[in-house]
């Protein structure tokens, strides 16, 4: 018996990153982790910077970094719209670690005119990228 699937499209501001049938999608929603499977109730929600993990129709898993965005679930399709989407293999671990360090330093040395919100977003994105890299490393080590 074939696995139940749903059409998933992951789109960035620049291009379509993934389009295909999936058995499962997991993202970080505004209220925590969110799993979507075929037959999920319709939904429209914000997603936070983090990982999108998909299980494709053939059972293979793929991981992406999302900078945040919108998740729309319809009866026959799921759409993820994000400003930035990166395949896990394309993340520059050193650049993400440096961005994290810069944001932490800026927040620690903040003055009166410091844009805390922008630094917090940069920090959240860098930490999310590093989590995606760590997840991939753990999966490879298995």
Swiss-Prot record:
UniProt-annotated location(s): Cell inner membrane
InterPro entries: ATP_F1_dsu/esu_C_sf (IPR036794), ATP_synth_F1_dsu/esu (IPR001469), ATP_synth_F1_dsu/esu_N (IPR020546), ATP_synth_F1_esu_C (IPR020547), ATPsynth_dsu/esu_N (IPR036771)
GO terms for cellular component: plasma membrane; proton-transporting ATP synthase complex
Origin: domain of life: Bacteria
Bilayer disposition of the protein: Peripheral membrane protein
Keyword Manganese: no
Coiled-coil residue windows: none
GO MF terms held by the record: ATP binding; proton-transporting ATP synthase activity, rotational mechanism
Keyword field: ATP synthesis, Cell inner membrane, Cell membrane, CF(1), Hydrogen ion transport, Ion transport, Membrane, Transport
Family of the protein in this entry: Belongs to the ATPase epsilon chain family.
Role this protein plays: Produces ATP from ADP in the presence of a proton gradient across the membrane.
Quaternary context: F-type ATPases have 2 components, CF(1) - the catalytic core - and CF(0) - the membrane proton channel. CF(1) has five subunits: alpha(3), beta(3), gamma(1), delta(1), epsilon(1). CF(0) has three main subunits: a, b and c.
Protein name (record): ATP synthase epsilon chain
Protein's organism: Shewanella piezotolerans (strain WP3 / JCM 13877)
Taxonomic lineage of the native organism: Bacteria, Pseudomonadati, Pseudomonadota, Gammaproteobacteria, Alteromonadales
